[in-house]
Amino acid sequence: MKTLVITNDYFPKKGGISTYIKSFEDHLEFEKIIYAPNWAEGPNVVNSKSRFIFGSRTHLREINQIINQHNIEIILHASSNPQFYLVNKLKNFGLKQYMIIHGAEFNVIDSIPIVKKIFRRSLESLEKIFTVSYFTGRKLQEITSTEIVLMGAGVEKNEYQKEFNENEKLIVGVSSRFVSRKKIDWVIDSLNDLQMDGYDVTLNIFGYGKLEKYLKKLSDISSQEVNFYSDDDENALDSFYKDLDLFVMPAKSRFFGREYEGLGLVYLEAASYGLPVLVGSSGGAFETIIPGKTGFIVGSRNEIYDAIKYFYENKDMIKDLSLIHISEPTRPY
């Protein structure tokens, strides 16, 4: 079945949705064409003339041309924003339309009165909606009668097994975009307090984003060692995870819950390396762990402090949780 995937999030663009869509496309068994902006790269990509696809007449003509040239049978919108503008406009093409909804991108739209009606009407026009977490699925069930299918998310299983030395310092890591909602500053502050209280800890940070200068300045005045990493080469992320003892990314919801963590692929990446994972209290993040067995939920600086202190004082638990990751690698994704 030939599928047209419409997306503004694709390689080489960075971010959780881009990573998810590229991985999803790589594992899609039937034929597909990726309609993406003019900067997108890939063997199945047909580039728009635009840097961003939102539903203009030009975009409709380009989509119509792709459908006719490649005998497209179904359309898959890879995200809800701004693809919801396209749904009703594409109805005249007579093809079934599906959509992947990841998380907060739809919740924010649905809170804006001027576009809320258009958005909900678009959802009703879809054949099915796929989502990555139970949390997002429940949110969607409140606003549409279209069938919601949990598609989940996943990462490649990793055979790496870390050797543990209980006498060494604890190396904590966070991998994320540098934005306020990810609360990386909480992690820096918590490890500073731990170091001041006599716990030998190091923080490794992998990522990019608008708060980079702020986070580096905060790190400069912190007592613990802080190292920043970037994806200079294809092995950078692999090396980053292999150096860690513990992973934390305390994502927090904003705007009274309208902006939240849909799931969090970085949690699954860390788990694939056998790392205990401290997840935030936002959205579907908690679905990536078995609380108390493969990680914990942390919703404040104090909780981050307490959780890291626990693993520092009980380093044998790091190995125990790692073995659980190895024995239960697919639960639930």
Predicted regions and their residues:
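Donor nucleotide-sugar binding/catalytic pocket of nucleotide-sugar-dependent glycosyltransferases
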Residues: H102, E124-Y160
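Nucleotide-activated donor-binding/catalytic signature segment of Leloir-type glycosyltransferases, i.e.
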Residues: K213-D238, L246
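Conserved acidic donor-binding segment of nucleotide-sugar-dependent glycosyltransferases
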Residues: I290-N302, I308-D316
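Single conserved hydrophobic/aromatic residue that forms the stacking wall/gate
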Residues: I324-Y333
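Short His-centered aromatic/hydrophobic patch
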Residues: H77-Q83, I101
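Acidic donor-binding loop of glycosyltransferase active sites
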Residues: K242-Y260, L275
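Short hydrophobic beta-strand element within catalytic cores of glycosyltransferases
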Residues: Y267, A271-S272, P276-V279, I289
